[in-house]
């Protein structure tokens, strides 16, 4: 019996708090009530994500990623997950980007993969264990990353061997 590979073309759709909720949280200030601080010269938006870094005595770290512009349509040949902690991507540039995700599991379920366009001035936080493709930038851009560092294997990579997945923006 010969198993045929499946070809799937995925088009990115607009992200919303609701359609992204099973993968993580949006990081924005549009629907939050800020706290006035610094004698009214600043507004503080608290508790924007569910940061998860403490498994196996891990700690939260902040990094900067410099991402290169991707070409579309693009082939998706792998996905990764971080089982021991969440991972937040906060753009430092006024540019939208794409995310490519699948629910938790032993491997990505090709029938449940989704892609979203993340608007300007919005970040995302992946829950621990969510399958995702590395950064997909529409332009060269910088990201502030809040991630986990510590003991244990916090990176699992899955390579698609037979299935062919194409992402269109």
What are these regions (language model features)?
Residues 122-125, 165-169:
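Short, surface-exposed linear segments at secondary-structure transitions and domain or protein termini
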Residues 1-6:
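Short, Lys/Arg-enriched N-terminal segments with co-localized hydrophobic residues
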Residues 120, 135, 162-164:
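Generic alpha-helical secondary structure signal
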Residues 85, 122, 139:
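Residues that flank catalytic or metal-binding motifs in active/ligand-binding sites
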Residues 130-157:
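A short beta-strand-loop micro-motif that forms or neighbors metal/cofactor-
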Residues 117-131:
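Conserved metal-binding segment of the jelly-roll/cupin
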Residues 7-115, 147-160, 166-169:
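Non-catalytic, conserved peripheral segments adjacent to functional cores
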């Amino acid at each position: 019996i010969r198993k045929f590979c499946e070809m799937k073309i995925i088009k990115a759709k607009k992200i919303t708090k609701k359609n992204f909720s099973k993968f993580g949280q949006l990081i924005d200030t549009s629907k939050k009530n800020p706290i006035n601080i610094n004698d009214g010269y600043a507004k503080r938006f608290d508790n924007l994500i569910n940061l998860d870094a403490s498994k196996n005595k891990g700690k939260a770290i902040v990094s900067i990623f410099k991402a290169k512009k991707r070409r579309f349509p693009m082939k998706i040949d792998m996905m990764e997950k971080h089982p021991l902690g969440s991972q937040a991507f906060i753009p430092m540039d006024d540019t939208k980007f794409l995310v490519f995700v699948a629910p938790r599991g032993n491997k990505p379920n090709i029938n449940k993969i989704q892609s979203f366009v993340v608007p300007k001035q919005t970040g995302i936080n992946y829950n621990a264990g969510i399958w995702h493709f590395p950064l997909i930038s529409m332009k060269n851009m910088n990201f502030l990353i809040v991630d986990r560092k510590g003991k244990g294997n916090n990176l699992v990579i899955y390579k698609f061997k037979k299935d062919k997945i194409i992402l269109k923006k």
